[in-house]
Amino acid sequence: PNDQVVYVVNDNYREPNKPFFAKVNLKGGGDAASAARAVLQTGDFDYAWNLQVEPDILAELLKGGKGEIKTIAGTSVERIELQFSDWKTETDGEKGKLGSVNPIIGDKAVRQALNLACQRDVISEQLYGEGQPPTSNILSGIAAMASPNTAWEFNLEKAGQILDEAGWTLNGSVRSKDGVDASITYVTSINPVRQKTQAINKQSMEKLGFQVELRQVDAAVFFDGSPGNEQNINHFFNDLQMYTN
């Protein structure tokens, strides 16, 4: 219920023979795999967009013979955002108050190390495929907007050196500095591709000495903008959050 919008042509539209379609049924909700299945396997819908579904599952759905997949490298980027504010501490009735400093992510060395711990090529090849290239630019897909001054690399040794030099010492399996453990939360929406991305990144981060708590939130909640919803991307009450934009 309440997950579909139906548009019907206006017979009095100002231009003759337009719009082309007499009726358009736009359906939301559900998950990416179900959307792909509705087009590729059952044929219930004509088009589905932003199918963040594993390549092997899409290949299987294609056997249904109802549709095809068109992949175009666009401007959307799956990214991990870092919370600079102290979201755990309440100041003047507000968590993550502007000007407060996240005791872990607020350290530039930590951010640099986390960046070096992301295997973009593995994530791209294994989980996305179809020519979805890894990138270091948040503005991507438009040559004129792509900075030539940024690059990415996966280098845990270099990341470890940066943390060592910044005073994040390894005590057992977890680093700490000034009495603060390198314990972080990492949230995204419930989606098989994103959960596998989380697992890949967590493994690398933990090798560096971070303690990582993975969190998953239903997409309808994660992307909901309600003021009272503390699990959405707008509140960002986590150290890391991941989604596409």
Model-derived segments and spans:
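Extracytoplasmic/periplasmic ligand-capture domains
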Residues: 1-127, 143-245
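Short, glycine/acidic-rich hinge or "gate" loops at secondary-structure transitions
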Residues: 130-136, 215
